[in-house]
């Protein structure tokens, strides 16, 4: 037997030994995986039972509070606060457990488990989401500038509007996955992206014509301004979130948003004039489109639908921002009155 063949035989025996170890490691891995699945099922079942009992207890306390004495009312209030805190703990626990997807994720992805099991994986996905928003915001800004000043073609407008549809669709999917993993983004700032997806889709279907050309430059100028504001928000919100997470005041899955939230009060109030300017520009778009819809040459259904959609965006953005500002001002006044 030649020396080369002997070396090959020795290497095969080494590989055989390593393969046996690999098989044993894989067997242990599958065993642990089954144990993990059993623990996940047990935890989910226990949480659901606890939630049901706490819900019943909360209803009982609410009924009892109506005819309780002053001392009893204080006890009921304390128990109610504890129940609310316990529900927040359950929310954090469920972020690490498999759960059924919501209707939207079921329609898009099917009944696939999107729960990430480690903090590292959750934060990596969240960070990748933030980078995606930043890169697409820059691309959309450049696209809007190009269409507004250099490329006066309907086909380039369609490419830009298609990019908007894809961007907002992707955001809604990624945000739904982040919510399933414990992100606390909620309310209007979630719905806002669904409305924006619809608006971009209607813009994409709007045929070229006199009415479209009358609104085109105004919409592209609005898109440029909106992208600039979103870039500013991302840049400053990310730094603010990093600081607040280091102080233990924010969750590691909190996201940057295209609006104003209570945690931005310290350090980011200078963004409010830009935000309100963007909100009123949406109102201006709505008014312009309502006027164009009554034009004698207007035949497109998209004009009136877009006017309503811009009005919905204005009302949602403006009222939500106004509510946050009003709440923070009231809290500051209450703190100032305390000795």
From Swiss-Prot:
Question: Is Transmembrane helix found in the keyword set?
Answer: yes
Name the domain of life this protein comes from.
Eukaryota
Biological processes, Gene Ontology terms:
fat cell differentiation; protein heterooligomerization
Q: Which family does it belong to?
A: Belongs to the TMEM120 family.
Pfam families given for it? TMEM120A-B
Q: Does the keyword Protein transport apply?
A: no
According to its record, how does it sit in the membrane?
Multi-pass membrane protein
Q: Which InterPro entries match?
A: TMEM120A/B
Query: Its function?
Result: Necessary for efficient adipogenesis. Does not show ion channel activity.
Q: Which organism is it from?
A: Bos taurus (Bovine)
User: What is the name attached to this protein's record?
Assistant: Transmembrane protein 120B
């Amino acid at each position: 037997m030649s020396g080369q063949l002997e070396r090959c035989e020795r290497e095969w025996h080494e590989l055989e030994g390593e393969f046996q170890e690999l098989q044993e490691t894989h067997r242990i891995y599958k065993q642990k995986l089954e144990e993990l699945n059993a623990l996940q099922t047990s935890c989910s079942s226990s949480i659901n039972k606890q939630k049901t009992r706490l819900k019943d207890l909360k209803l009982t306390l609410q009924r009892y509070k109506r005819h309780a004495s002053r001392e009893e009312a204080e006890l009921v209030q304390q128990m109610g606060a504890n129940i609310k805190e316990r529900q927040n703990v359950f929310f954090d626990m469920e972020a690490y457990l498999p759960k059924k997807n919501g209707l939207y994720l079921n329609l898009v992805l099917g009944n696939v488990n999107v729960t990430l099991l480690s903090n590292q994986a959750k934060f990596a996905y969240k960070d990748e989401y933030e980078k995606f928003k930043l890169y697409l915001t820059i691309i959309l800004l450049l696209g809007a500038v190009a269409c507004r000043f250099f490329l006066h073609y309907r086909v380039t407008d369609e490419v830009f509007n298609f990019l908007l549809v894809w961007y907002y669709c992707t955001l809604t999917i990624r945000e739904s996955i982040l919510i399933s993993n414990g992100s606390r983004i909620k309310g209007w700032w979630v719905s806002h992206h669904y409305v924006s997806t619809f608006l971009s889709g209607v813009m994409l279907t709007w045929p070229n014509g006199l009415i479209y050309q009358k609104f085109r430059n105004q919409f592209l100028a609005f898109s440029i301004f909106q992208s600039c504001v979103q870039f500013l928000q991302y840049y400053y919100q990310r730094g603010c979130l990093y600081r607040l997470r280091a102080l233990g005041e924010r969750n590691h899955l909190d996201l940057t948003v295209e609006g104003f939230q209570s945690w931005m009060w310290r350090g980011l109030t200078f963004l409010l004039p830009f935000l309100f300017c963007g909100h009123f520009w949406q109102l201006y778009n709505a008014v312009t489109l309502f006027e164009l819809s009554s034009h004698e040459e207007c035949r497109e259904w998209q004009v009136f639908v877009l006017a309503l959609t811009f009005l919905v965006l204005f009302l949602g953005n403006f009222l939500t921002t106004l509510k946050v500002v009003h709440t923070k001002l009231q809290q500051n006044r209450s703190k100032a009155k305390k000795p």
